[in-house]
């Protein structure tokens, strides 16, 4: 059992790049994963679960790149109990300053019967072999019994004890289907600490199917867990995971109830990290999202406004500045030069050089001609868009035109460079965005269907940048795209073409893998 009294530091295990990326429609490129990982390091997370290396060559390459280039956090890879998977996972994380192998297997009766078709004894033996092999490769091994909250406790204790005996130093209790209730989940954590002997850290991994992921995570910490697994913005499969920003601020604000605990998170980076993940994944942050939502510190009721104007603590338990939610500072205008632009990015923790810097600066100058002042949020949107178009794009938008009116179909025409050759196309659709999607699909010769569309204002004002996020189904594979502009129609065209370029890269990678 871990000695809670000597481990008051709560480890924050971020799984945005693994469990978070499993959300439908999210498909991150290696450079986007690296950018998120670098921001997570600036945020101060303890462990980054960078991916599932055996899932694909692309996932393996992304994990290995993060292991080699991101410094500070432990870089972790997920693995099944198969020895070959564990060895593949090790190859992906081995170059990290600090690395971990995270081994999992299902343990609930439902999963054993319908998924694994294994007996309890067979699962125990698989865990024994897997942890022993992982421990031969690395010093830091984590074990997760998937669907733990629906696993009979005697069998759960048995599996966890075997994992500890073979060398696992972290035992994770996953509420895989969001079944847990805070007080019941806390009792489970307490019982594991009591019944499983040895030296280890207890971790929790809570899903949000009942809207209780954050509450369950905080209850687990109060019961003795010293690691929390979570995702930025709470993204993930189905209803998502525990939101990192909520867990961290819950621990900070209610230490009087939870216990005298701390994390290594620089909370001033929370809002920026949230915006970055939102833009790169194409998943918007709901306006009323706790901590990082647009309305998290907004007040409309007259009584509330009066109280906040007198003393913000009357209706706010979090200082907006402490989580990076203060008003974005105006930093640049159309007369700003390349050096000032690069310095502004550096102050934001963004380092660009070479072609990436040139492309981003050129896009900045284009938008600065239309917008009087650009804020940090504007710059973040520009960088996010341009970094998504630097990976050898096949398609480049030259020009487009859309005509629409009441009672008739929208008609669009466009010129697109396809591998450097101009291609002209025209199409009609049910509205301007649908027509744009159809004409760009025709120009690129991809069978594409728009499945999701959202638009948000990056900043306020009549000249505000609009950020458009789309999801597009291309041959049964869903990809996301984004675009920014002061013109929403142009932002939509950029987002659609960004998605089509991603789809083309996915096809090219698949073709290369099939070639001997």
Curated annotation (Swiss-Prot):
Catalyzed reactions: 3-methyl-2-oxobutanoate + acetyl-CoA + H2O = (2S)-2-isopropylmalate + CoA + H(+)
Binding site for Mn(2+): 19, 205, 207, 241
EC primary class: transferase
Keywords for the protein's UniProt record, in alphabetical order: Amino-acid biosynthesis, Branched-chain amino acid biosynthesis, Cytoplasm, Leucine biosynthesis, Manganese, Metal-binding, Transferase
Protein name in UniProt: 2-isopropylmalate synthase
Matches recorded under HAMAP family: LeuA_type1
Highest taxon above the source species: Bacteria
Entry's EC annotation: 2.3.3.13
Annotated region described as Regulatory domain, given as residue ranges: 396-516
Binding partners and assembly: Homodimer.
Domain Pyruvate carboxyltransferase per the UniProt entry, residue ranges: 10-271
Cofactor(s) required for function per UniProt: Mn(2+)
Family designation: Belongs to the alpha-IPM synthase/homocitrate synthase family. LeuA type 1 subfamily.
Subcellular location: Cytoplasm
Gene Ontology biological process terms from the UniProt entry: L-leucine biosynthetic process
Pfam families: HCS_D2 (PF22617), HMGL-like (PF00682), LeuA_dimer (PF08502)
Organism: Acidimicrobium ferrooxidans (strain DSM 10331 / JCM 15462 / NBRC 103882 / ICP)
């Amino acid at each position: 059992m871990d000695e809670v009294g000597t481990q008051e530091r709560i480890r924050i295990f971020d799984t945005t790049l693994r469990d978070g990326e499993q959300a439908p429609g999210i498909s991150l490129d290696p450079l986007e994963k690296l950018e998120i990982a670098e921001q997570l390091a600036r945020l101060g997370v303890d462990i980054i679960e960078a991916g599932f290396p055996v899932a694909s060559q692309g996932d393996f390459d992304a994990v290995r790149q993060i292991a080699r280039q991101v410094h500070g956090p432990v870089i972790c890879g997920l693995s099944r109990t198969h020895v070959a998977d564990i060895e593949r996972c090790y190859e992906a994380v081995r170059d990290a300053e600090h690395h971990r192998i995270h081994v999992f297997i299902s343990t609930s009766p439902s999963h054993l019967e319908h998924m694994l078709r294994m007996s309890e004894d067979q699962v125990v033996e698989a865990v024994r072999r897997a942890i022993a092999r992982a421990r031969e490769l690395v010093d830091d091994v984590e074990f997760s019994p998937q669907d733990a909250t629906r696993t009979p406790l005697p069998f759960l204790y048995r599996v966890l004890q075997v994992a500890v005996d073979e060398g696992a130093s972290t035992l994770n209790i996953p509420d895989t289907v969001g079944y847990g209730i805070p007080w019941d989940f806390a009792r489970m954590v307490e019982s594991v600490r009591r019944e499983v002997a040895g030296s280890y850290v207890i971790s929790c991994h809570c899903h949000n199917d009942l809207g209780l992921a954050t509450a369950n995570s905080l209850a687990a910490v109060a019961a003795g867990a010293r690691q929390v697994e979570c995702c930025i913005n709470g993204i993930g499969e189905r209803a998502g995971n525990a939101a990192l920003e909520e867990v961290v601020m819950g621990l900070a604000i209610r230490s009087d109830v939870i216990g005298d605990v701390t994390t290594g998170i620089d909370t001033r980076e929370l809002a920026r990290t949230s915006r970055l993940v939102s833009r790169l994944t194409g998943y918007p942050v709901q306006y009323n999202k706790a901590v990082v939502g647009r309305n998290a510190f907004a007040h409309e009721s007259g009584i509330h406004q009066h109280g906040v104007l007198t003393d913000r603590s009357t209706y706010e338990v979090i200082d907006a500045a402490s989580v990076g939610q203060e008003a974005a500072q105006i930093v640049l205008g159309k007369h700003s030069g390349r050096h000032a632009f690069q310095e502004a990015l550096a102050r934001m923790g963004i380092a660009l050089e070479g072609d990436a810097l040139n492309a981003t600066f050129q896009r900045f100058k284009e938008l600065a001609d239309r917008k009087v002042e650009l804020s940090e949020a504007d710059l973040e949107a520009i960088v996010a868009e341009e970094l998504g178009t630097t990976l050898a794009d096949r398609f480049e938008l030259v020009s487009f035109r859309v005509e629409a009116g009441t009672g008739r179909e929208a008609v669009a025409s466009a010129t697109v460079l396809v591998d450097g050759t101009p291609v002209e196309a025209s199409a009609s659709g049910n509205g301007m965005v649908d027509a744009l999607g159809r004409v760009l699909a025709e120009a690129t010769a991809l069978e594409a269907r728009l499945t999701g569309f959202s638009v948000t204002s990056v900043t306020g004002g009549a000249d505000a940048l609009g950020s458009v996020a789309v999801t597009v189904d291309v041959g049964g594979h869903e990809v996301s795209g984004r675009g920014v502009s002061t013109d929403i129609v142009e932002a939509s065209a950029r987002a659609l073409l960004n998605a089509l370029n991603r789809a083309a890269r996915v096809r090219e990678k698949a073709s290369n893998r099939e070639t001997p």
